[in-house]
Amino acid sequence: HDTQCAVAAMSVTDEDAAFLSCGTWSLIGCELDKPMLTLESNQKELSNEMGANGKVNYLKNISGLWLIQETRRDLAKQGQKYSYNDLEMMARDAKPFKCFVDPDAPMLSAHGDLPNKIRKYCEKTGQEIPETVGEIVRCIYESLALKYRYALEQISECTGKNFGVLNILGGGTKDGFLCEMAANSINIPVVAGPIEATALGNIILQLKALGEIESVDEGRKLIAKTEKTKKYMPQRTDDWDGAYKIYKELLNREEK
């Protein structure tokens, strides 16, 4: 499975590391020695998936960069053609923390007219309505970063683990803006890479099966030595703490 292979290719081997396999979807979690089979875990919609090396990948599935991709596609249909770099630059220039969405809200899950759906979500929840393209894209980025924090808090509550670093894997590692925001929101360092985590994880597992390496951990150390990664340190964490308080209240209202 692509997610399990990606996690096998983690470039961070710290015991307190969490992972985020990030692309069209976001799968955030940690490795455990055994499944977490509790009512609380079920209520928080956390899943246990068999991983590499006899471990369990305990995670939450969240929407991901599909939201940016779909927004870009809808804008292009309206004659507004932007590169991903254009969208990032406009988002960087937009007002921070103007409004938020739950990336997993049912009304945002279908194709078509996503910018207007985001506006309607903000109107429905009594928030400021994003008007410009930059405000809409920034809303998506900030909401993803805050949802990552929310999910890791849930995982911490269920496992008792405190996380000291987040390893982002896959195509999302190329999105520096999202990596920055994840570090700021969660208030832990983010290590982005490897990009081709799924392929590398697959290679590691095959090398182990062939006896070329002794363990997945040995393969991860090879990846850490040979693959390019980038580290992001938390910044402006007080601002993000304030935004998270508002965001958490929004999610709690939506869940009722």
Annotate the PLM regions.
Residues 1-165, 174-198, 204-235, 239, ...:
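Active-site core segments that coordinate phosphate-bearing ligands/cofactors
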